[in-house]
Amino acid sequence: MRFQGDAALVRSRVYGRLEIQMSSTAHNLRCTECGTSITPDAVSSNFRCPICNGLYEVCYPWKLRAAGPDSNLPNASALRWLWQERRSSNLAIDQSGVWRFRDLLPILQNPDNAITLREGNTPLYDLPRCAKAAGIDWLLAKHQGMNPTGSFKDTGMTAALSVAAERGFEWVACASTGNTSAAMAAYAARAGLRSIVFIPEGKIAWGKLSQSMDYGALTIQLKTDFDGCVAILADLVKRFPIYLLNSVNPYRLEGQKTPAFEMVEQMDWQVPEHIVVPGGNLANSAALGKGFSEMQQLGLISHVPKISIIQAEGANPLYRWYNDTNRIMRPVTADTRATAIRIGNPASWRKAADVIEQMGGWCEQASEQEIALAKAEIGAEGIGCEPASAVTFAGLKKLVAQGRITREERVVLILTGHTLKDSQYTIDYHRNELLTDAEISQATPAQRAQHAGLRKPPMVLEANPDIVLRTLETHMKLAQVVQPA
């Protein structure tokens, strides 16, 4: 890329045009329901609009100017150059895949106050065998499970917790199905803040629970579900000076929009036709939609992708809303082994619904056996993910079968969590101890054959080389007969 003048001059021009946006008045908060706009210091402790109880989104001056003929927006080419240049920096803030794009999230009075674990910069994997199984030519996976604490929550937590630290809070808290608590506890520890985690007793994976304890959080298990934990915490933040870090906090979404920037940068600023996202509390879908929309407003991309959201059949309030002719959101009692999306009353459902409607995607659901099969198929690619992530591939196969996604479309799955987040699920699957008879009965003959071929239970043998050799010979002969898809 060629510019007039030397690199220092280009850098000066880029920073000069963005400098005003890095001040404390560079953004406001707008209610997504009634449109009321407030300053950041006027927001309530529960991040709800006092007029309509809606959620806020962060708005910037350049978003308002984008519609005008004389917008004076930052130069898209210069921004791309600047973000690439930061990759060679030794500064922690530049090595972060979130704060490297800080020009598009000026939420701190001083960017040097960012609390970072060098999150982001996650890989974009090619999935050729999964693409073939789904009936499409081109499939990638943006693996957010490769973040420091193993999930996409890190990208949002670095942003929101940095705001909490800069504003002088000592205590932070969240309700969680596991990933949010792990991320919050880690970033709070990094910042020297005290953290409180509320989790539903017996309803999150042990690997996630161990993280919040290891990072020093006060971990409280409540005899309720996730939505019950949210209600308790919402009451507590009104009584004590605790900074709420659930996804109702709009600064979480500012960090969680950055994988959209990373994705198109990794694709040489080309936009895939379709993004498929798992749906739990639904803030991630909303954040990605915001990221793509802002890139289009700034001229970084020419168009936005479709975004489809997939939910577990046992935790599917958005899917039910999507298929309800009256479009009424009705909370459900969530029940799925994909614990990260075991949420029956998602806080960000309206934002996510807007993303589907505005960007032209769909909402689907996947059964427990479909999720388990999809997880095993992704694992067979050498990638791996937690169960909630696999719902994307299960849903993709349905969307292709329905003709909603065509063979030629470029599709990206958002994998939100690492496979080690719920290792017991994986062990139970391969030992054929995960699914019930009723769940297995829902599988087609082809799906049952796939399950049988993908399960790899450990074998226990006598410590005898002849026995081991005979077993290996038998296994190798079978492997030649049953070739992987």
Can you describe what each PLM-predicted range is?
Residues 1-21:
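N-terminal amphipathic/basic-hydrophobic helices that include classical n-h-c signal peptides
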Residues 20-485:
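PLP-dependent amino-acid enzyme catalytic core
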